[in-house]
Amino acid sequence: MKIQIKGGRVVDPGSSGDKVQDVFVAAGKIVALGTAPGGFHANHVIDATELVVCPGLVDLSARLREPGYEYKATLESEMAAAVAGGVTSLACPPDTDPPLDEPGLVEMLKHRARSLNQAHVYPIGALTQGLKGERITEMAELLDAGCVAFSQADVPLNDNQVLLRAMQYASTFGYPVWLRPRDAALGRDGVAHDGQVATRLGLAPIPTIAETVALSTILLLVRETGARVHLCRLSTADGIDMIRQAKSLGINVTCDVSANHVHLSEMDIGYFDANCHLVPPLRSIRDRDALRRGAQDGTVDAICSDHTPVDEDAKQLPFGESESGATGLELLLSLTLKWGDEAKVPLTAALAKVTSEPARILGIQAGAIAVGANADVCVFDPNARWKVEPARLKSQGKNTPFAGYEMGGKVRFTLVDGHVVYEG
C-alpha cells in the first residue's frame, strides 16, 4: 500500500520539525517527506489540509484486561479505543490474571494483539513471580518472549532485599525496571489523598509520604545498583522535587505522570464521584500544578493515559468500595494538547510527551516522522471540538472523570505499519 498524506502540518517532536509538507508511505515505512520519490504512485491520498500529522502516540500505561479480566474489557475493544485515540504503540502492565510472569502468557498476548492488526502492544513483564514480591522472575526468558521491561504494576514490593536483588540482576543485563513508588503500610486501605476532601468526606487517606518514602528507597537503590529505572505515575509535588534533584545528581531515572493527574485534583471528587477514584489518588491543587511544571521543565519525561477500564457495576459502589481506574486511551491526545495550550508549551514539545519521549523510554523504533521511520502516524484536527460522551467511547470501560468535558483535537486518521486502521 502506497499512501500520500497531502498538505498537512507535519510535526516531528524528536527533531522539533514543524512544517507543512507531504508525507509518502510505502511498505510500512515513511519513504519521503515533501517531494515524492521517483516512480511513486499513491494507492490512497489523505487530504490533511489544516490537519496536524504527527507520530502515532506511544502510551506507557494501558491495561488491556487480557488475560483474566475480559468482563471488564477485551483486546478487541481496547485496541479499537487505542487507534481511535491516535495511539499506535502501548505498554501494558503485568497485573493480569494470571500475571505476566511466564513466557507463554506473554507470547499469547502478543499473538492476540498482532492478529488484530491495530496498535503495537509491548508487554511489561512481572518483576516477581505472581507479583508476590518473593522471588524474581526469569527475566531473560520473558524478554525473549517480547517483554520490554519488568514491573510490579500497582502491587507493592515490601521486601527491600528482594527489590535490591531484582535491581542488581536487571542492572547486570541492562533490563529496564519500572516501579510506582508506593509504601503499602503508609497508605493501607486508603482511597483518597490525605487532604481536606478526604477529611470532609470521611475517606481513608493516602498521605504524600506513601509515595515519597518509597521513592527515596528506590532512588537509593538505583544509586547503589546502577539499574535503569522508570518511575510510573508520580502524583506529588514532593516526589517531583525528588526526581528533579536526582536527575541533577546524575541518577539514571525517568518518570511519567498520568493525564488525569495533570488536569484533576482532589477537589474533583466533589460529592463521592467514584469516577475520580484513581490509583495513585488525585492529590492537592499544589501537587497537580507541580506535575504540570515538571512536565514543562523536563523533570517529567512522559505523560501516559493510565488507561484502566472498569465495569459499570464496580463504579456504582460507594467511593471507598468502588474499583479504582479511568478509561484514557481516547483522551490522551486531547488532554495533552489541553495541557500544552494552558502551559503555553510549543506543539512539538507537548507532543513529545506522548510520542518521542515514551518511545525512548520503551527503547522502541517509534515516535518519529522521518524518512525510514515506521509509518505509525496520527493525523488530527487541532481545531475540532468534541464532547466526552462515555457511551460513544470505543473502550468497553466507560468510566471517566472527564464525562461532559469539551475537548480540543480530534483524530481523523491513524496509520499503523503504513495501513489506515482508523478513520473518524
What annotation goes with each model-predicted range?
Residues R200-R228, N275, G294-I303, T308-N383:
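His/Asp/Glu-enriched, well-ordered alpha-helical/loop segment
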Residues M1-F40:
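N-terminal metal-binding scaffold of metallo-dependent hydrolase/deaminase domains
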Residues G8, G28, E50, S61, ...:
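Divalent metal-coordination and catalytic microenvironments
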Residues T49-A113:
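Metal-associated gating/positioning segment near the N- to mid-region
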Residues P37-V53:
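Active-site metal-binding motif and surrounding structural segment of the metallo-beta-lactamase
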Residues P318-E321, N374-G424:
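C-terminal cap of metal-dependent C-N hydrolases
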Residues I136-I303:
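Histidine/acidic residue-rich metal-binding segments in metalloenzymes
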Residues P103-H120, Q168-L179, L335:
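Alpha-helix-loop-beta-strand connector modules within alpha/beta enzyme cores
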